[in-house]
């Protein structure tokens, strides 16, 4: 009777242990016969030459037997690796050797990703792969326009070493599958995996194909190594389906597509692309689909139905992967038969429409594993840990800039963080692009987690489009997602773009956040506000009318919206300018920062505004920092200014240098709501070095302004010296 690989391994290991113990006992007894133990510090009596020779011979024999048993144990493990995969009853990964993949072999992974939600899901999948991987990766992403914009920017700012990204336009592949009726919730994108032999480069010979709802619990190189086990006509590596779907017994009159036994799940696929092309894969799946659709009328599980119909007709095409490479958490799963302990898990597949809410007796364990990567700091994955050459395109210029900085500089933190690369996830939640309108305006602002409560309030005051940059950690981003999905107010809005900038460093990158929100607005005009301000009711329509009254051929204008503030957390918000003036007179409202930074808004000329009925022009003055409406193509904010101090002042100065007219709107206002001091303003007030660094950055900004605008910028230097 032949032993299984596991039995052989256990027997040899036990034999090796017993032999070692016997050798030790023999030597101990031999020494004890001469009245001496083998203690390392005790003096030894001289043994007779014949006994010593016999002892050495037996010791050499024991060592040789030990070596031989170790060699046999290794051979059993190698034999196990070459024969253990792909058997239906193999539910444990203990006997599987680690990857045979070469250390720096490039692993190719293909993923179909479309829309805002799928773009979020794929990030968690990629994190789990990157966390475990030890090889360079090349991701092939088949995307729609939304996912291309979101993921293209995310990976460009993520800058992970030894990671290449290629994008493929899903629109060019849709005609190949659009004729197939599909009832699956993934829609037409759930069929695109059928087209990968056409979509991917012709010189790419093999690829791992993954759904976006996959989580890896091991090194993907182990899965890649299984390609070497393919033999004969095998071109597809798949795990058996772990529900009774294809057996047709889930409910009365259930008629599934044809499948081999339980069928196979296509959440994880190994594709031998070169062989698939040789056997005419495109024609094969198309003819099979046409034949089956005559009876089935539509697919229920998208591409999976067609893959299974092909395998039913040609079973030699499939290599059955061990089930732990796709532990399926569907509504009718039997996946618990696939693992006995955590070490058995390789890949978790959340293939139920209910996702994390699926019913499974071990779902808490799986959910914890998933949440680990969902909230994992993606910046940590930038570190080069695999010892393979990185692709040049993933190395940002910021690294070269950082290496040139002087770490002894008292302002080193400011300079380092001003050039740091932050991961940016655009359009974190679904939203619609506003229809073209020459007078439309987007409210632009930035915030951190502690200002999240302002979102619903602003939504009640501003009905127009918004572009908001949120500075969050990976974990906070998920808290924001849950908050937004639970808010009826936010869910009712489809014209708000939320753009997550992930935390990096200690200083708040306020101007980077403003630039992200500014560049990702989609209207001709923007209202550059801050999150702590509530717009007056009707401000959106008033600004549109004010923009329409401008002379399009005239000089560029910055329309100033006067700012006020209240110290009361509960405020009866003014419904008109008359109400606001009354509240000013009673002390319920004040002009913004009149008591701590009066010159920041004094040039607005509040006395004139009280009685103004038409827009009026004002002149620039030092430290002026109003909130303005400008064209979207205005100058960006200077990102050297971080935290507190001069971040808006520098922007208004540049608008003036570009000869923008500063015009105050007579019937517009915003009100600043009270909040606790930010961390950065506290540091500005308490740290002399912080203030000195802000001053140094101001001087450098003045010099740069002079270089760009020449003599026109002299007045700013003069004003600075006369302060």
From Swiss-Prot:
Residues 383-723 are annotated as: Glucuronyltransferase activity. Residues 107-382 are annotated as: Xylosyltransferase activity. Binds 2 Mn(2+) ions per subunit. The xylosyltransferase part binds one Mn(2+) and the beta-1,3-glucuronyltransferase part binds one Mn(2+). CDD domains: GT8_LARGE_C (cd06431). It is a single-pass type II membrane protein. It catalyses: 3-O-[beta-D-GlcA-(1->3)-beta-D-Xyl-(1->4)-Rib-ol-P-Rib-ol-P-3-beta-D-GalNAc-(1->3)-beta-D-GlcNAc-(1->4)-(O-6-P-alpha-D-Man)]-Thr-[protein] + UDP-alpha-D-xylose = 3-O-[alpha-D-Xyl-(1->3)-beta-D-GlcA-(1->4)-beta-D-Xyl-(1->4)-Rib-ol-P-Rib-ol-P-3-beta-D-GalNAc-(1->3)-beta-D-GlcNAc-(1->4)-(O-6-P-alpha-D-Man)]-Thr-[protein] + UDP + H(+); 3-O-{(1->[3)-alpha-D-Xyl-(1->3)-beta-D-GlcA-(1->](n)-4)-beta-D-Xyl-(1->4)-Rib-ol-P-Rib-ol-P-3-beta-D-GalNAc-(1->3)-beta-D-GlcNAc-(1->4)-O-6-P-alpha-D-Man}-L-Thr-[protein] + UDP-alpha-D-glucuronate = 3-O-{beta-D-GlcA-(1->[3)-alpha-D-Xyl-(1->3)-beta-D-GlcA-(1->](n)-4)-beta-D-Xyl-(1->4)-Rib-ol-P-Rib-ol-P-3-beta-D-GalNAc-(1->3)-beta-D-GlcNAc-(1->4)-O-6-P-alpha-D-Man}-L-Thr-[protein] + UDP + H(+); 3-O-{beta-D-GlcA-(1->[3)-alpha-D-Xyl-(1->3)-beta-D-GlcA-(1->](n)-4)-beta-D-Xyl-(1->4)-Rib-ol-P-Rib-ol-P-3-beta-D-GalNAc-(1->3)-beta-D-GlcNAc-(1->4)-O-6-P-alpha-D-Man}-L-Thr-[protein] + UDP-alpha-D-xylose = 3-O-{(1->[3)-alpha-D-Xyl-(1->3)-beta-D-GlcA-(1->](n+1)-4)-beta-D-Xyl-(1->4)-Rib-ol-P-Rib-ol-P-3-beta-D-GalNAc-(1->3)-beta-D-GlcNAc-(1->4)-O-6-P-alpha-D-Man}-L-Thr-[protein] + UDP + H(+). Glycans are attached at residues 91, 117, 169, 241. The keyword Metal-binding applies. One of its GO terms (cellular component) is Golgi membrane. Mn(2+) 2 binds at residues 530, 532. Pathway: Protein modification; protein glycosylation. It is found in: Golgi apparatus membrane. One of its GO terms (molecular function) is glucuronosyltransferase activity. Gene3D superfamilies: Spore Coat Polysaccharide Biosynthesis Protein SpsA, Chain A. Its cofactor is Mn(2+). It comes from the Eukaryota. Mn(2+) 1 binds at residues 211, 213. Residues 1-10 are cytoplasmic. Residues 32-723 are lumenal. GO terms for biological process: protein O-linked mannosylation. In the C-terminal section; belongs to the glycosyltransferase 49 family. Bifunctional glycosyltransferase with both alpha-1,3-xylosyltransferase and beta-1,3-glucuronyltransferase activities involved in the maturation of alpha-dystroglycan (DAG1) by glycosylation leading to DAG1 binding to laminin G-like domain-containing extracellular proteins with high affinity and in a phosphorylated-O-mannosyl trisaccharide dependent manner. Elongates the glucuronyl-beta-1,4-xylose-beta disaccharide primer structure by adding repeating units [-3-Xylose-alpha-1,3-GlcA-beta-1-] to produce a heteropolysaccharide. Supports the maturation of DAG1 more effectively than LARGE1. This is Xylosyl- and glucuronyltransferase LARGE2s. It comes from Xenopus laevis.
